[in-house]
């Protein structure tokens, strides 16, 4: 029934455009059954809806959405977009130089999820009418990420994707064994989904893997986490931390980024990063060093020189591309050197002793002044001598002679 309707529509349209009802008798028209194709597009990218026909004169092309909305119209050798639905304005065009060769494909710019659906192309020529159906499906898969977070005393791995459509398949593995994860956080909109999938790994030394799959786009992303054994170093020493990509995920022809970070107060500060696309290396820590020869061999191990006590903590190497994220974490414990420890021990003894001595001195001075003030108030005449005398409590200063003579040895008196 639909085919008959389409045929009648084009017979009327073509004959009316030719200016004569009798130029193309009905017997000369050939109806070609509808073909159906599926086209998959990505959000905000351009696509082509294919349609072809046998070459003929007086070509008429109409593209419609859901058989109702006019997407694009072409006849008499040019576009006629007066009745085009506004949502398609400035987004569609034909391959005009190829129409004469039987190409009625539609170039579609910046597709959105609202563009999903069935598109029908009606093509009429002087001798035939064809209809081609195209089913457009649109997918979204912004690059996911794997993050490591500290929440109070707990450690979490989080696999997240900011925008994805349709709803993805997320799986977790621990030491290559599938595990269940029931804490997925999902927010949806008309355009896409935003998904976070956290996993508590507190106290675990296992390796973890998260996979996010978009079945429509046939695209899979993998995040992998590995914890290395803890390292104990002395102050002023240096430490070497390994970071190498896994061959199963790494592709040398694919752009990627490497970032080394150190965690302090629950947040990571970037020590250095490397961009494969530009071979550019940025180092934010003067004691950090990379071996360029190793980098050329895809080995991103690093050295940190002249360690100090504040360097204790977690160090994270992140290798990321559009298809994977590889996280490697090291825990470094920096301990005081023996010289520093002995020095600190001496300070622990010396400082309290000095504080005690200072306290006793201050106390003695205060006591002495109090005694002098008390004696001055009882014997004002002896004030000058009392100011020069300070004795322990319970004792008195020697009394001055009553006759005013100077104190001399008894043997010196006449």
Swiss-Prot record:
- List cystine links: 159-210, 243-317
The record's section on PROSITE patterns has:
IG_LIKE
* Tissue spec: Expressed at high levels in colon, kidney, testis, lung and pancreas, and at lower levels in small intestine, liver and skeletal muscle. In immune cells, highly expressed in B-cells, dendritic cells and macrophages. Not detected in T-cells.
User: What keywords are annotated for this sequence in UniProt?
Assistant: Disulfide bond, Glycoprotein, Immunoglobulin domain, Membrane, Repeat, Signal, Transmembrane, Transmembrane helix
Task: Give the signal peptide as a residue range, or say none if absent.
Answer: 1-22
- Glycosylated at which positions? 90, 103, 318
**Keyword Lyase appears in the UniProt entry:** no
Q: Name one GO biological process term.
A: regulation of cytokine production
Q: Which residues form the Ig-like V-type domain?
A: 61-131, 235-328
- Transmembrane spans: 345-365
> Subcellular localization, per the record?
Membrane
Record PANTHER family:
BUTYROPHILIN
* Task performed by this protein: Through interaction with TMIGD2, costimulates T-cells in the context of TCR-mediated activation. Enhances T-cell proliferation and cytokine production via an AKT-dependent signaling cascade.
Name the record gives this protein: HERV-H LTR-associating protein 2
| Gene from which this protein is expressed | HHLA2
């Amino acid at each position: 029934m639909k085919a008959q309707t389409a045929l009648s529509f084009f017979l009327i349209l073509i004959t009316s455009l030719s200016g004569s009802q009798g130029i193309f008798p009905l017997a000369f028209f050939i109806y070609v059954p509808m073909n159906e194709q599926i086209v998959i597009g990505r959000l905000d990218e351009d696509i082509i809806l294919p349609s072809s026909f046998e070459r003929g004169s007086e070509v008429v092309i109409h593209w419609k959405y859901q058989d109702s909305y006019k997407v694009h119209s072409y006849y008499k050798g040019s576009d006629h977009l007066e009745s085009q639905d506004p949502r398609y304005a400035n987004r569609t065009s034909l391959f005009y130089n190829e129409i004469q060769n039987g190409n009625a494909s539609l170039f579609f710019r910046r597709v959105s999820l609202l563009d999903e659906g069935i598109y029908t192309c009606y093509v009429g020529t002087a001798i035939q009418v064809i209809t081609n159906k195209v089913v457009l499906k649109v997918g979204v898969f912004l690059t996911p990420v794997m993050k490591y977070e500290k929440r109070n005393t707990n450690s979490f791995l989080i696999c997240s994707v900011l925008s994805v459509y349709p709803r993805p398949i997320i799986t977790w593995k621990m030491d290559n064994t599938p595990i269940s994860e029931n804490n997925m956080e999902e927010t949806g909109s008309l355009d896409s989904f935003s998904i976070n999938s956290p996993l508590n790994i507190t106290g675990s030394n296992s390796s973890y893997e998260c996979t996010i799959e978009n079945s429509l786009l046939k695209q899979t992303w993998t995040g992998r986490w590995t914890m290395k054994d803890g390292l104990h170093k002395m102050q002023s020493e240096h430490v070497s931390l390994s970071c190498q990509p896994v061959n199963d995920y790494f592709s040398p022809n694919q752009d990627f980024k490497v970032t080394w970070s150190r965690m302090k107060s629950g947040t990571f500060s970037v020590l250095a990063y490397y961009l494969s696309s530009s071979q550019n290396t940025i180092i934010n820590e003067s004691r950090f060093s990379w071996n360029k020869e190793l980098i050329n061999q895809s080995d991103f191990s690093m050295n940190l020189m002249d360690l100090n006590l504040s360097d204790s903590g977690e160090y994270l190497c992140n290798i990321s591309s559009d298809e994977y994220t590889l996280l490697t974490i090291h825990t470094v414990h920096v301990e005081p050197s023996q010289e520093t420890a002995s020095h600190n021990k001496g300070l622990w003894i010396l400082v309290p002793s000095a504080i005690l001595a200072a306290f006793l001195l201050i106390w003695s001075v205060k006591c002495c002044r109090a005694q002098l003030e008390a004696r001055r108030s009882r014997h004002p005449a002896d004030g000058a001598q009392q100011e020069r005398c300070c004795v322990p409590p319970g004792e008195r200063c020697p009394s001055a002679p009553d006759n005013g003579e100077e104190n001399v040895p008894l043997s010196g008196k006449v």
